[in-house]
From Swiss-Prot:
The lineage of its organism: Eukaryota, Fungi, Dikarya, Ascomycota, Saccharomycotina. It comes from Saccharomyces cerevisiae (strain ATCC 204508 / S288c). One of its GO terms (molecular function) is Ser-tRNA(Ala) deacylase activity. This is Putative alanyl-tRNA editing protein alaX. May function in trans to edit the amino acid moiety from incorrectly charged tRNA(Ala). One of its GO terms (biological process) is translation. It holds the Pfam family tRNA_SAD.
Length: 456
């Protein structure tokens, strides 16, 4: 047994000995070390406890999150404080709890785990063991790796319903019949023939000939640690450090998708989810179906047909729009060139006040460029588009002179507060975007183009 200030090794943690211990667990703080960012500033602390019911990330299972309640130590013991543990990481045989507050080593804390998250993770993880075991036993299909879905990250703080699916990578693609049969058998083992799940622990150099240790992490010293083997009835025996259910009935249900993704040659990813996720997924998908029915004014079975029909209509409308954009651009460019020639001032502008998209302005620029390519004399052209529905706009300034472009951009910038753009330092094209425009600014812009700019 470890001494009071000697931490229990990963493999024999309280969360691994009893995965249903969710709160009320008291232990000691062994160490509390600061973590620093790239600037050397303290951004948090890593705490190692004498023992813990918070599982450190490993075995394809994310870490738990939870709280530490200070019950005595360097703070007022009469006031219990809750400190959030955002995640727990493993360093060799040690579990490190990531927190924002310093806790004095020797302090007694009470640990609580996020029970809902733990149960969800166990349902997915135990479900994966059972799924892989059935595939290997019945079809000789090997699980190469697996990944748990439904994990919120900084890169993806909001998850789509499909993000909650886990996947196992297999050494070949399954047929639809195989997926159906596997689903039926697993649901039988959940509902009608539940299997007891037992965790066997071996310490140090005990013989483990019947269990492969090839997937034990390289940084886990098995000679000093604990080898945990998860037995699901007589169906499966596999080494695993994760937390698991006590019986297959606790998996609740399993949903396996028929669509698979090809990866690494002939390998395939099979997507599945277990337990409460299945009902939550059904609710979210049902809402999407109801919303789609209402928006499309059709029944569920007609949604696909309706979307296909509308997609074709949109494609046809896009083709028509492109045709008329080119026609309008050609006409506008001819008018611009006529204005340049007639005025003798080499200044002209175009303004569209309703559907003045950047696409239209760029097409006009393309047409105008064909006229200007052989013109060596000076010119200044402003193309302005306003989209009334979004209250945004676009601007192009064309000139052979970078100085002229800069002057015009400055003038327009003094009128339009939210105009930003660039380019044309050596002549050519300056392109800008107006993120929003007031009525007063729009009136001032119109006045500038028709009077100040055109009459100079």
């Amino acid at each position: 047994m470890p001494t009071p200030m000697t931490p229990v090794k990963v493999g024999a943690l309280a969360c691994q000995r009893n995965s249903f211990l969710f709160d009320g667990f008291k232990t000691l703080v062994v160490s509390c070390e600061p973590t620093k960012n790239k600037k050397g500033e303290i951004e948090g602390y890593e705490i190692e406890l004498q023992d813990t019911i918070l599982f450190p990330e490993g075995g394809g299972q994310p870490s738990d999150s939870g709280f530490l309640k200070i019950v005595e130590g360097n703070r007022n013991s009469s006031k219990i404080e809750k400190i959030l543990v955002s995640h727990v990481s493993r360093f060799g045989l040690h579990a490190k709890h990531h927190v924002n507050d310093y806790i004095e080593p020797g302090t007694t804390v009470e640990v609580a785990v996020d029970e809902q998250k733990r149960m969800d993770y166990m349902q997915q993880h135990t479900g994966q063991h059972l799924l892989s075991a059935i595939l290997e036993r019945n079809y000789k299909v090997d699980t190469v790796s697996w990944s748990m879905g439904g994990i919120i990250t900084k890169k993806k703080p909001v998850l789509e319903p499909s993000d909650y699916f886990n996947y196992i990578e297999l050494n070949r693609k399954l047929t639809l019949d195989e997926i159906t049969n596997v689903s039926d058998e697993i649901n039988q083992l959940i509902i009608n023939f539940p299997q007891e799940i037992i965790v066997e622990e071996r310490i140090g150099e005990e013989t483990v000939d019947e269990v492969s240790t090839s997937k034990i992490p390289d940084d886990y010293d098995l000679s000093k640690g604990v080898l945990r083997t998860i037995h699901i009835g007589d169906i499966d025996s596999n080494p695993c450090c994760g937390t698991h259910l006590k019986c297959t009935s606790q998996i609740g249900s399993i949903l396996i998708l028929s669509n698979q993704s090809a990866v690494r040659g002939s390998n395939s990813r099979l997507y599945f989810m277990c337990g409460k996720r299945v009902s939550l997924y059904a609710k979210s998908v049902n809402k999407i179906l109801l919303d789609s029915k209402n928006l499309l004014s059709c029944s569920e079975t007609q949604i696909s047909e309706k979307i296909t029909r509308q997609t074709k209509q949109i494609q046809q409308l896009n083709k028509r729009e492109q045709y008329w954009i080119k026609r309008l651009a050609r006409t506008a460019s001819e008018e611009l060139m006529n204005t340049l020639k007639a005025s003798g001032k080499k200044r002209a502008y175009f303004m569209e006040e309703e559907y003045g998209t950047l696409e239209l302005l760029l097409q006009i620029h393309k047409e105008v460029s064909n006229f200007l390519k052989d013109d060596t004399e000076g010119y200044e052209i402003i193309l302005c588009g306003y989209e009334r529905q979004t209250n945004t706009g676009s601007l192009l300034i064309l000139s052979e002179s970078g100085e002229k472009i800069a002057n015009l951009a400055a003038n327009l910038g003094s009128i339009l507060q939210n105009l930003k753009g660039g380019g044309g330092k050596k002549g050519g094209k300056w392109q800008g975007k107006i993120t929003s425009i007031s009525n007063a600014e729009f009136a001032a812009l119109s006045d500038y183009l028709s009077h100040d700019f055109a009459s100079c």
